[in-house]
Amino acid sequence: MAIIIGADTAGSKLKDVVKDFLVGENFEVVDVTQDGQDFVDVTLAVAAEVNKQEENLGIVIDAYGAGPFMVATKIKGMVAAEVSDERSAYMTRGHNNSRMITMGSEIVGEGLAKNIAKGFVNGKYDGGRHQIRVDMLNKMC
């Protein structure tokens, strides 16, 4: 499993904090950020890498998280969540099988961002009754 991470200019500093944290937790992290990229391009780059392997997960950081979330949900087969707390990050993996989260650097601080990332990457899909919902989401794209 690789964690694919990216950020626009507004999210770059927090992205580096999250990236360093995940590397310290022994996760393979692939940073697709390119200087000056808009959140749309960053989100598309993260999603492309996430979709290369079923077990890959993605994190996109900009100022508020909403823009990358809107982009991610337009991509076929991508289930994404905009999160600003640890519980939602963990639960979106368990119940929705989300493969990407977005967050805003002007919404969450460094400590919370680390905990969000940790909850997301350590979350496991529960399957079962939740698969019906995931199938519905996948039919929409």
From Swiss-Prot:
Gene3D superfamilies found in the cross-reference section: Sugar-phosphate isomerase, RpiB/LacA/LacB (3.40.1400.10)
Question: Per the UniProt record, which EC number(s) apply here?
Answer: 5.3.1.26
One GO BP on record is: galactose catabolic process
> Per UniProt, which keywords does this protein have?
Isomerase, Lactose metabolism
* Disulfide feature: none
Query: Which Gene Ontology molecular function entries are recorded, alphabetically?
Result: galactose-6-phosphate isomerase activity; ribose-5-phosphate isomerase activity
Pathway the protein takes part in: Carbohydrate metabolism; D-galactose 6-phosphate degradation; D-tagatose 6-phosphate from D-galactose 6-phosphate: step 1/1
Q: Which reaction does it catalyse?
A: aldehydo-D-galactose 6-phosphate = keto-D-tagatose 6-phosphate
The family assignment reads: Belongs to the LacAB/RpiB family.
Which proteins does it associate with, and in what oligomeric form?
Answer: Heteromultimeric protein consisting of LacA and LacB.
Q: What is this protein called?
A: Galactose-6-phosphate isomerase subunit LacA 1
Q: Which gene encodes it?
A: lacA1
